């Protein structure tokens, strides 16, 4: 008898009322300042309004930015709570936009919790979804195992934060825009790395620079 010792979940939801939510997310994004960082994409990741922890933790006040995202994804978080028998709380959120030749190198979001990506502007004819890298290789060939979910605009993909992942080069002139966030399954289990001021409310990412010419 053959049994599988390990499995890694990934959750995908189609956002309700997406036409309106897309406009709401884009309006929120347009209020932010996106800059190019070491991730080789435009993001507001380091801006103050994206930084948060529950105010009772005594580290940051919860900004309207985060509250708005919580409101927009309230129903989807209720689905996650039901499916995983959890009490999910979004504790950090940011936007990311990839223009021509932009990409996000391989990285993780720390040792615990869940993370998510919401595809806001995404054309499957010219864009590719997030690439997830297995923490173990193929048991026969030893080759690296990758997984790319099939997605479209309005899809919300949630995954364990420790999973290495990246985005491929945007080879088109069509911008690719996502919202990302970190969340905990309940407020008693927030990864400590997300609550340190030096890490701006998030775990310190491990960024692997791409090879020259890629």
What is each residue range found by the language model?
Residues 165:
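Glycine-rich nucleotide phosphate-binding loop and flanking beta-alpha elements
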Residues 1-84, 103, 199-202, 213:
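Non-heme Fe(II)/2-oxoglutarate
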Residues 9-11, 175-179:
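Short beta-strand micro-motifs in enzyme catalytic cores
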Residues 12, 28-38, 132-138, 152-153, ...:
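UBC/E2-like fold recognition across ubiquitin and ubiquitin-like conjugation systems
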Residues 89-158, 168, 175, 185-195:
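Catalytic core of non-heme Fe(II) oxygenases with the double-stranded beta-helix
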Residues 131, 182-214:
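Double-stranded beta-helix
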């Amino acid at each position: 008898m053959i049994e599988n010792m390990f499995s890694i979940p990934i959750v995908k939801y189609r956002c309700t009322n997406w036409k309106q939510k897309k406009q709401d997310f884009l309006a929120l994004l347009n209020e932010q300042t996106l800059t190019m960082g070491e991730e080789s994409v435009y993001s507001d990741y380091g801006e103050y309004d994206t930084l948060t922890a529950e105010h009772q933790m005594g580290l940051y006040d919860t900004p309207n930015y985060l509250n708005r995202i919580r409101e927009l994804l309230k129903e989807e978080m209720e689905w996650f709570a039901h499916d995983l028998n959890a009490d999910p709380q979004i504790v950090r959120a940011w936007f990311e936009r990839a223009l021509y030749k932009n990409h996000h190198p391989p990285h993780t979001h720390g040792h615990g919790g869940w993370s998510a990506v919401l595809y806001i502007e995404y054309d499957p004819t010219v864009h590719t979804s997030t690439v997830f890298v297995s923490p173990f290789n193929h048991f026969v060939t030893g080759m690296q195992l990758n997984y790319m979910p099939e997605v479209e605009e309005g899809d919300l993909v949630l995954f364990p934060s420790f999973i290495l992942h990246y985005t491929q080069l945007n080879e088109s002139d069509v911008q690719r825009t996502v919202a990302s966030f970190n969340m905990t399954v309940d407020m008693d289990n927030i990864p400590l790395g997300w609550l340190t001021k030096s890490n701006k409310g998030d775990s310190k990412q491990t960024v692997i620079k791409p090879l020259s010419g890629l």
